[in-house]
């Protein structure tokens, strides 16, 4: 089995050039003086990934207030990314305000250790990297294909890193910068039904009484 090479905390984040939904980008040159949250998703038009992108977009201003640029990535083509972004806008009324890298040759994914063969040799896992305004890798988190990320925790992580830098301190378990007003709702208790694998299944799925935003993204209570 191929050995996965991972970047290391405290070292410069791997440099790259890539095509995105916002045009070509060059890292770190295009992001000097900014923090970056670079995150990969397994594939466009998949349900868990869609919920993550909706959540990142809804919290975009929170990241912006912290001088953080979001960058998404998968091995899909730019055409697929654009179609998916348009689908998200149509079905959820949400604009995706950050670039998504089209890493079809897996060049960036391999630099950041996003391909884990035991999970998939053709999809990236849910990897996330926090890179500071000096281009240094400060934190990384890997999630399996089945589990969506908690965007509030990503924001808390950024807050903790920036507070540690600014104040010369460390943050304890469960630390938050101030009392939070975030509340969980019934929506947070729903799970995603695996997407259909045939056209017939897709048609049936829409008739089975699940809560479906589109044919590929349906939820239910358990």
Curated annotation (Swiss-Prot):
Listed PANTHER family: THIOREDOXIN PEROXIDASE, THIOREDOXIN-DEPENDENT PEROXIDE REDUCTASE, MITOCHONDRIAL
Reported function: Thiol-specific peroxidase that catalyzes the reduction of hydrogen peroxide and organic hydroperoxides to water and alcohols, respectively. Plays a role in cell protection against oxidative stress by detoxifying peroxides.
Thioredoxin domain ranges (all copies): 7-163
Disulfide bonds: 212-218
Annotated GO MF terms: peroxidase activity; thioredoxin-dependent peroxiredoxin activity
Transmembrane segments: none
Protein location: Cytoplasm
Other comment: The active site is a conserved redox-active cysteine residue, the peroxidatic cysteine (C(P)), which makes the nucleophilic attack on the peroxide substrate. The peroxide oxidizes the C(P)-SH to cysteine sulfenic acid (C(P)-SOH), which then reacts with another cysteine residue, the resolving cysteine (C(R)), to form a disulfide bridge. The disulfide is subsequently reduced by an appropriate electron donor to complete the catalytic cycle.
Family: Belongs to the peroxiredoxin family. Prx6 subfamily.
UniProt xrefs under NCBIfam families: PRK13189.1
Biological classification of the source: Bacteria, Pseudomonadati, Aquificota, Aquificia, Aquificales
Cellular component GO terms held in the UniProt record: cytosol
InterPro entries cross-referenced by the UniProt entry: AhpC/TSA, Peroxiredoxin, Peroxiredoxin_AhpC-typ, Peroxiredoxin_C, Peroxiredoxin_TDXH, PRX_1cys, Thioredoxin-like_sf, Thioredoxin_domain
Protein name according to UniProt: Peroxiredoxin
Active-site residue numbers: 49 (cysteine sulfenic acid (-soh) intermediate)
